[in-house]
């Protein structure tokens, strides 16, 4: 008579999941409960930090964006050409923010409702990168418009027409689409068997993610350099106005503009630091992963996989 082997997860209350059934026969595991806790934490992080919390935040942000469109679009039609030149960039940024929200909704849909394959992942990355790059472009356009309006007011009034602003926005969007498509195709190179590239996970994951970090860091750097240049230029202009004894309302307005730009620069720089740092941690975690492990090897590597998921969570919440 065969004696059934004891359940190694029986002494792990609160951590047991139905997914543990394939791991009961593993012989290379010494402490099942520790690994069960890691797998349970991974499941909870995926459920709450990548699905429920981002979706709740996105619903709130989506309502705010709908309100912005509801208020901005009718008023934009009533504005004169000078005001439209400023708010057309704000409208572009609102579109980018809405795309970012939709990208957050797409992530759990891809994870839970579809099979991972090259075209699905590439489409998601393209959409996400397009929202990010178009947002960066909107920030750059708004900052440059403020710079021209303050430093070169005559050119802003006479030469910088609404048509030129629209053409600039179209140029930024076309550039964002081009870069996003390139990033989407490259970053999804090792996903699925139907990928047009013969590149396996172990060889491609690290270089592809490094390529993504370079693209993101370059976009952040361009925007931050332009913001810093405008802040320094306005600061010098303010010093010159003070030396001339100019204490008019225009000078006070310049001080307010500088404060807003500096606050935006600080927030954007903080976001860039955390985004790039989290991406670097993600690359280090990916370098330790492999898709060729069997179920028991995957369970034994649960700690490193938990760190990998935490990196993904940080990136998701930051975005």
UniProtKB/Swiss-Prot annotation:
Write down the membrane topology: Multi-pass membrane protein
Where does the UniProt entry place glycosylation sites? 28
What is the similarity comment for this entry? Belongs to the G-protein coupled receptor 1 family. B0244 subfamily.
Q: Provide the protein's localization.
A: Cell membrane
What is the name attached to this protein's record? Putative G-protein coupled receptor B0244.7
> What are the annotated GO cellular component locations?
plasma membrane
Identify the species of origin.
Caenorhabditis elegans
Instruction: Name the keywords, alphabetized.
Output: Cell membrane, G-protein coupled receptor, Glycoprotein, Membrane, Receptor, Transducer, Transmembrane, Transmembrane helix
* Family matches, as PANTHER family: G-PROTEIN COUPLED RECEPTOR B0244.7-RELATED, PROTEIN CBG16518
Give the transmembrane region(s). 49-69, 107-127, 131-151, 166-186, 206-226, 261-281
A single Gene Ontology molecular function, please? G protein-coupled receptor activity
Q: Is Transmembrane helix given among the entry's keywords?
A: yes
């Amino acid at each position: 008579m065969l004696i059934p082997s004891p359940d190694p997860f029986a002494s792990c209350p609160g951590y047991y999941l139905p997914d543990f059934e394939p791991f009961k026969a593993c012989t290379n595991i010494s402490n099942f409960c520790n690994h069960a806790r890691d797998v349970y934490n991974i499941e909870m992080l995926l459920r709450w930090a990548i699905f429920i919390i981002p979706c709740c935040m996105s619903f709130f942000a989506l309502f705010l964006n709908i309100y912005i469109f509801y208020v901005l679009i009718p008023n934009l039609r009533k504005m004169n050409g000078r005001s439209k030149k400023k708010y057309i960039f704000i409208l572009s940024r609102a579109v980018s923010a809405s795309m970012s929200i939709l990208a957050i909704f797409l992530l759990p849909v891809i994870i839970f409702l579809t099979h991972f394959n090259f075209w699905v992942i590439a489409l998601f990355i393209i959409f996400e990168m397009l929202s990010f790059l178009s947002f960066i472009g909107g920030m750059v356009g708004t900052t440059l418009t403020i710079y021209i309006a303050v430093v070169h007011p005559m050119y802003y009034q006479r030469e910088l027409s609404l048509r030129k602003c629209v053409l600039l926005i179209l140029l930024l969007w076309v550039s964002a689409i081009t870069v996003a498509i390139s990033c989407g195709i490259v970053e999804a190179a090792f996903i699925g068997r139907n990928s047009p590239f013969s590149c396996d996970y172990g060889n491609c994951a690290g270089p592809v993610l490094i390529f993504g970090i370079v693209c993101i860091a370059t976009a952040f750097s361009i925007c931050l350099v332009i913001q810093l240049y405008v802040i320094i230029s306005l600061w010098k202009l303010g010093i010159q106005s003070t030396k001339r004894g100019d204490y008019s309302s225009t000078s006070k307005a310049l001080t307010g503009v500088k404060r807003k730009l500096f606050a935006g620069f600080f927030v954007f720089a903080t976001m860039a630091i955390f985004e790039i740092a989290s991406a670097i941690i993600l690359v280090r975690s990916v370098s330790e992963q492999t898709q060729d492990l069997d179920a028991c090897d995957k369970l034994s590597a649960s700690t490193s996989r938990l760190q990998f998921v935490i990196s993904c969570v940080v990136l998701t919440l930051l975005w």
